[in-house]
């Protein structure tokens, strides 16, 4: 392991829950407006996850006022307060780009049931 890998390992967050594409997430993001700070919650379906060490990202999609909104979050960003997994989805793909074309009930994802 070289110096760069060691520095990246130190900066990675340890409290990230296990999630994948298809899961419904609630992401708490720190927002700074002037001298005020607040937490904004973004809830939606994870449509993709890109794992590459410190540069890992995930994309969350939600429907807001009839418009699809997608937001890309860096996984190890200090601006992310916490990530909550609300529902584990049952999908057969790693990238759910097909959800962009679907509307209404067709865009629903089945819930994975545990026995």
Curated annotation (Swiss-Prot):
GO biological process: translation
Gene Ontology CC entries for this record: cytosolic large ribosomal subunit
Molecular functions (GO terms): structural constituent of ribosome
Keyword Membrane part of the UniProt annotation: no
Keywords: Ribonucleoprotein, Ribosomal protein
Pfam (any one): Ribosomal_L19
The keyword Oxidoreductase is assigned to this record: no
NCBIfam families associated with the record: rplS_bact (TIGR01024)
Family of the protein in this entry: Belongs to the bacterial ribosomal protein bL19 family.
Function: This protein is located at the 30S-50S ribosomal subunit interface and may play a role in the structure and function of the aminoacyl-tRNA binding site.
Protein name (database record): Large ribosomal subunit protein bL19
Gene that encodes it: rplS
């Amino acid at each position: 392991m070289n110096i760069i890998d060691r520095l990246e390992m130190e900066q990675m967050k340890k409290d990230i829950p296990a999630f994948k594409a298809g899961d419904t997430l609630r992401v708490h993001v720190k927002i700074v407006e002037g001298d005020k700070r607040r937490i904004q919650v973004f809830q939606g379906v994870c449509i993709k996850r890109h794992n590459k060490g410190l540069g890992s990202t995930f994309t969350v999609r939600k429907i807001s006022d009839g418009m699809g909104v997608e937001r890309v979050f860096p996984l190890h960003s200090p601006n992310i307060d916490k990530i909550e997994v609300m529902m584990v989805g049952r999908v057969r793909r790693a990238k759910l780009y097909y959800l962009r074309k679907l509307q209404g009930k067709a865009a629903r994802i089945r819930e994975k049931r545990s026995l």
